[in-house]
Curated annotation (Swiss-Prot):
Gene3D superfamilies: FAD/NAD(P)-binding domain. One of its GO terms (molecular function) is NADP binding. Keywords: FAD, Flavoprotein, NADP, Oxidoreductase. This is Ferredoxin--NADP reductase. Its cofactor is FAD. InterPro entries: FAD/NAD-bd_sf, FAD/NAD-binding_dom, Fd--NADP_Rdtase_type_2, Ferredoxin-NADP_redctase_2. The keyword Ligase does not apply. Homodimer. Its EC number is 1.18.1.2. It comes from Chlorobium phaeovibrioides (strain DSM 265 / 1930) (Prosthecochloris vibrioformis (strain DSM 265)). Binds 1 FAD per subunit. FAD binds at T25, E44, Q52, Y57, V97, F132, D298, S339. Belongs to the ferredoxin--NADP reductase type 2 family.
């Protein structure tokens, strides 16, 4: 990934907008700050920007971002950062914002778990679904010693499954995507789903059906994982139990559990904001119940919200735009097309070259 400027100086500089969260929504919000001539700081709890795209499935291909017929998750993050870095936003990684307070002058002060304190004129929450942890199968007991070697909850590198017999558990988008995506990588793929039909995208479900008909994937519906058989420091097989109580054994080297994640807003849940379904309620201007505090992306809730990357990018643009009325009260907010703004910037660069 393109090198990121990491803010390491004294936390005394007052900037216009603090963006909490460095996933796609947060990165694009930083770009929008540059486009609107306001300063910003991005605070991300992970070691790198990119959120779930980089942390959980960097090699997963994404198909529903405008302008990208198909793009690996990590490449999308890199492109977003390349678009943003020209404005040199301050970036703080590896720190989690644990609290905020509104000052008498209307500014906001946030504190992190590392003891850092930052002040800004407005705040934007772009923390996705908050902290997340994978859902596990309680019937397997303690398998922590197998996690990351034989048992996985995400595909971070296809090489982990190269030439291996893989059992994939789940029926949503991730399970279907990797049933298709690991063909030609794994030596064998078995998909196990406890329900009678898939819940993932129709196109991918059809591709899985076609792979099953072609004999390149084994599919077990109405079936659950009952147990695993160990061999040395890995696994030898997975025992399956069908709803009719019959059982079967599938030889396996890897168990890929793609049954979702449990999200937790963490400290944000205690900030006194209006919440619904583990998300922060915003108005048409992306403003929360606290004046000067905005939210965008998966963490923001409003009628008709669709939780996809594309919507998060739109939310970010809206939130930054409307934050200007709080950051610069009384000033007339003028819209400038990006093509015009960039043309002026390039002309200025050429004049100073």
């Amino acid at each position: 990934m393109t090198d990121q400027p990491i803010f390491t100086g004294a936390a005394g500089a007052i900037i216009d907008l603090t963006i909490i969260g460095g996933g796609p929504t947060g990165i694009f919000a930083a770009f929008q700050c540059g486009m609107n001539n306001i300063s910003c700081r991005v605070i991300e709890s992970m070691p790198q920007l990119g959120g779930q795209l980089r942390a959980l499935y960097p090699e997963k291909h994404i198909y529903d971002v405008a302008g990208f017929p198909e793009v690996p998750a990590a490449s999308l993050v890199d492109s977003l950062w390349q678009q943003t870095e020209r404005y040199s936003p301050e970036v703080v990684t590896g720190e989690t914002v644990v609290s905020f307070r509104k000052l008498e002058n209307g500014n906001f002060e946030v504190s992190t778990d590392a003891g850092s304190v930052f002040e800004s004129r407005a705040l934007l929450l772009a923390a996705g679904l908050g902290a997340f942890s994978p859902r596990k199968l309680p019937q397997l007991g303690d398998i922590s010693d197998l996690e990351g070697s034989s048992v996985f909850y995400a595909v971070k590198a296809k090489s982990d499954f190269e030439g291996k017999r893989v059992v994939i558990v789940g029926g949503g988008d991730s399970a279907l995507d990797w049933t298709v995506g690991l063909q030609g990588v794994a030596s064998g793929i078995t998909l196990v789903h406890r329900m009678h039909e898939f819940q993932g995208h129709g196109k991918t479900a059809r591709e899985v059906d076609e792979a099953r008909d072609a004999g390149t994937v084994d599919v077990h519906l109405n079936t659950e994982v009952a147990s695993i058989e160990r061999r040395g420091e890995g696994i030898a097989s997975v025992q399956l139990r069908r709803k009719n109580a019959s059982v079967c054994t599938v030889e396996a080297d890897r168990l890929l559990l793609l049954i979702g994640f449990k999200s937790n807003l963490g400290p944000i849940a205690n900030w006194g904001l209006e919440l619904v379904d583990n998300a922060v309620v915003v108005d048409a201007h992306m403003k929360t119940s606290v004046d000067g505090l905005y939210a965008a992306g998966d963490i923001a809730s409003y009628p008709g919200k669709l939780k996809i990357i594309q919507t998060g990018l739109s939310d970010a643009a809206m939130a930054v735009r409307h934050s200007l009325t709080y950051i610069k009260p009384g000033e007339k907010i003028r819209h400038s097309f990006s093509s015009v703004k960039m043309a002026k910037a390039k002309k200025k660069e050429e004049e100073h070259a």
